[in-house]
Every structure is written in C-alpha cells, then in structure tokens.
Amino acid sequence: PRATTTAHVDTLSIEDKLKYAIINGEKSVGEGAQKKPLEELLEDALAQYTPLDLINTVLLDGMKTVGDLFGARKMQLPSVLDSAGVMKSAVAYLEPKMEKQSGSQKGTIVLATVKGDVHDIGKNLVDIILSNNGFKVVNLGIKQPGDSIIRAAQEHRAHAIGLSGLLVKSTLEMKYVIQDLERQKLEFPVICGGAALTRKYVEDDLRREYTNGVFYADDAFAGLHIMEDLATENGARDSRLREGRTVKEYAKAAVVDEETGPVFAERSPVVGDVPNLPTPPFWGVRVRKDYDLREVFRYINETALFKNQWQLKTASQTDYLRLVEEKFRPILHKLEDEVTESGLFAPAVVYGYFPAQSDGNDVIVYGVPSGESRVPSDNSRELLRFTFPRQREGRRLAISDFFAPKSSGKMDVIGLSLVTIGHQASVETQRLFEAGEYTKYLYLHGLSVETAEALAEIHHKTMREELGISAEDSPEIRDLFHQKYRGSRYSFGYPACPNLEDQTKLFALLKPEENVGVRLTSTFLLEPEQSTSAIVVHHPAAKYFVV
C-alpha cells in the first residue's frame, strides 16, 4: 500500500476510504466482510455530497496526493496510472448522476502530437493525468498539422494547446504552429513537451516567436501544474502568463553554419584498411520470421525498459534495484509470457548484403552479382549512394570511412536491415489506452518498443556471425548494448547518420512494405512504431560518434 495501511482502513471516514482507493490504485477497500467495492463507497458518499462536489473535493484531493508522491519520488509512474484508472472508474460511475452543467470541469486543453511524428505515449500520459485531475482533454492524436490543432482550440475554446513530439524535427513543427498562432493574433497559451525538446529551446527560442505564452513541461505533472494556473480566473493565471511571455536568455553555444566553408571529403587518418574483407553468405535480400520470441526477450535492455519506457525514478540506486527485483522484473516476465502465448508480437526481419565502396563522403551501393558468381565484378552497376556528414574537427570521421575506397580496387560489403514486431502491438496498446487500462498500456507499449530494439540487437549478432566477425563479441549480452563487438549499426536520424530521407533508399533495396508489412510515412518514419532500420558496418573502427 502507498497510503494508510489496510489494518486501519475500516476505521477511516468515507472521504478517507475513497482517497485511500485512489492513492493505492485499488477498486475495493477494506478487509474481509468489511471490504467494499468502489461503487458502494461512492454511493455511501453521495448521502453527503453531490456528485460534482464529491469529485472536486474528495477525489481530486486524492489525485493531488498522488501527484505530490510522484514529485517526491515516493510513487512510480505505473502506480500513478493505477490511481488514474480508479479515478476514471469513479468519475464514470458518477457522471450519469450529475446534472449537465457547464463549468463542471476545470478547463480545456487541446493535445496533439505534431505533424510528421507518430509517437503518442508521452501525449497520452498527459491526457491520462489531466483528464483524471478534472480537465477536459481534446486528444487529436498523432501527425497533426498546425491548422487542425488551431481549429480544434478555437472550436473547443481551449484554455491551452499542448504540443508533443519525440523527434528533433518535431521541435521545428512546434515552432511553425506557434508562428501560425502569432500570425493569426490568437491568444492560446502553448505547453510543449517531448524527448528532443530542451527548456532553453522553449523558454528562449520559442518565446521569441509568440507573445501569448509558451511553456516547457518535462513530464505530465509539470503540464498539470501549468494548466491549473492557466485555467483559473485569478492572479495565478496572470502570473503564469507573464512567465510564459518572458524570454529567458540562455548562453549561446557556438553555431557552425553548415552551408559555409569547404566540405571535407578526405578519409579520416585514424581509419585503416581491413586486410581481409568479409564475404557474406549471400548477396541480395532475405526475410526471416523464425526468431524465437523467448530468445529475443533475452536481448532486452532492462535499463532502457525500466528507466526510459516505464519511467522508474528512485531516490537511490539501492531503491531502484530493490524495486526492479521485487516488483518490476516479475511484471516483465509475466507480460512476456502473455505476449508469447497470445502471439501479439510477430518478429520479422528483412535484411540484405550488397557490394559497396566509398567515394569521399559517399557510400556507393552496387547491384548484386548475377548467376552463380559470388564475387562482384569491377563493372558492377551503381544502384544508389548514401552521403554522410563528416566531423569538422578531431578525428574527422564519416561513416563512409569504414568502407574500402573506390580507388583501392577492392569491393566491400554493406549490410542493411529492418526489423519489426508487427502491427498488433500498436492496435492492442491503443485499445488499452481507450479502455482506461492505463498501467497495462504503459507496460505493453514500453515492452513492445524495447522488443523491437532487442530484435535489432539479436539480428545484428546474426549478421556478424554470417560475416564471420562474431569472434570479437562479448559473451555477456549486456555488453552488446555498449558495442562490445566488431563493427556497428547506424540508424537514420542519429548524429552520424542524420538524414531520415535516406530511409527511402533502404526501402528501395529491401522492400519492407511487401516483405514484412512496414511502411514509410510522408516524413520518413516507420509504421508500425515498433520497427527499426539500420546500416550494418563490419569495420573494426566503426563505433558511434557525433558529427
């Protein structure tokens, strides 16, 4: 329990029993014969309160305690979602008994993941927290253009607009929405959140674009606190708006203009030639759908799952390890059993090997040898080129350095891969969200994303084995998360391989839509979200680096 112990719960007042239910995420309260379901407790309370008063005074007070416990790191996000689930059930029970009246909610926010971004977990968590703290949430979904967001804010007379996005590109889309609001002289305060955002970008750059308030929310409860001020009609709103209009001067980093100065194309001096280039077991493309899900689960990065996806936050590493051992690893194993038995995850891989050479900052990909030939010829047909950025100082690396230069006369090999666990995971997580099964939604979404990453990890190991370079693999799976193996895999959208549009080239070669059912969106993202693609490089010097 997270509140009063069960030994004393039977002696509590009806108000405290309801708060206990919310804080502890339990839909029945009491011991033995005294145990009562939530609906009975609500009926008892209705003898003293109107439904609206019960929500606003007792139930929301319970949710406030939940927020305080979360802020103090005394409650984990999954437990917060348990509480939100109880709150949702209580409100759903009371709503038919309420007179329809305006003003029964604290205020309205229009929420959206911006144009081009398919990620919705962060936005949906904000929806859960705000809607179960008395706010009306108009959740527009993913990939929302600015005009749709603004139109919805006008239609619903929103107190604020909430913009969410995971990608670096999404931060620019947020700026475009804010510029549109300014151009139209509209006055909706805007709350921004997402993994690629920084406080500096919001409070400095974005506030320069808009005169009516822009706020940075690093989690759902930060968004709640901002909304609570914006939805009031007193000094708190004015004070909060003044804050949102005040540009905060941050120290400016030195800016390099990418368009000026020479483009260096000379191979880095720290990258040597590979004396014996590996030969792949086949040229061209293959599809694999025979990975054992149990084996894939062994390659899940638990730190990424527990800390990033499930958002475990503790006061100390000791507390974290105890929580993982006592609560969260058992939950993980139970969920793995469920998805294995149900067939919800369907691991599938399309990958291939192609002859390749470097030409300055380019990697040239050639057609595969025809007939029985295992060796690409010197007059192989060029299919396409990937162009990579180069570091301007230091080691001056580019991914192209890790391939044999065209001038060497040697033909190298490039690996390409795309992995997915299929569409059903997305369908089921959306169903759980809409059904109010918030905690299971968080758990399943996190597991689905990390299972796709685990599939990428285990398949990269398979490719190293096929290329004959796996002898350098660490025997410890956790070491593989830190590149304790020969070579590297680079995914589009990351610093050394930033151009998302290059996904179209990978798609031209691997044909993932027809082979494994993964499509490319208009902004070059993979759908379903639980998919990832990569360029696979065998060179011993190839590791992650920042350009």
Give residue ranges: language-model regions.
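Conserved helix-loop functional segments at active or binding sites
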Residues: 44, 65-72, 89-100, 132-140, ...
